[in-house]
Amino acid sequence: MVERFSDEARNTALNELPGWSQVAGREAITRTFTFRDFNEAFGFMARVALVAEKTDHHPEWRNVYRTVEVVLATHDAGGVTERDIRLAEAMNAIARQCGGI
């Protein structure tokens, strides 16, 4: 099992993740991605799904038209772990490739 980050470690990691923030009242991080249209948003989700399956770490997310709201936490650890930070980094990179604005 992976170890949950301390508040300090989580905050340090968040400082290196553009667009991500702490979820109020919960041990999780969040970001809303915006794309030009639904096609780009869905393409982003499809690419992230492949990474999530490969790493066996899945996001909580919601899509409405051109936006994708994401929450990441490692449930087994009860908070944010290295797995969440790695998936957030991958999502940021994929969003850039998919035209995220």
Swiss-Prot record:
Catalytic activity: (4aS,6R)-4a-hydroxy-L-erythro-5,6,7,8-tetrahydrobiopterin = (6R)-L-erythro-6,7-dihydrobiopterin + H2O
InterPro entries tied to this protein: PCD_sf, Pterin_deHydtase
Keywords: Lyase
UniProt xrefs under SUPFAM superfamilies: PCD-like
E.C. numbers: 4.2.1.96
Name of one Pfam family that matches: Pterin_4a
Superkingdom of origin: Bacteria
Entry GO MF terms: 4-alpha-hydroxytetrahydrobiopterin dehydratase activity
Uppermost EC category: lyase
A Gene Ontology BP annotation from the UniProt entry: tetrahydrobiopterin biosynthetic process
Family named by the database record: Belongs to the pterin-4-alpha-carbinolamine dehydratase family.
HAMAP family: Pterin_4_alpha
Protein name in UniProt: Putative pterin-4-alpha-carbinolamine dehydratase
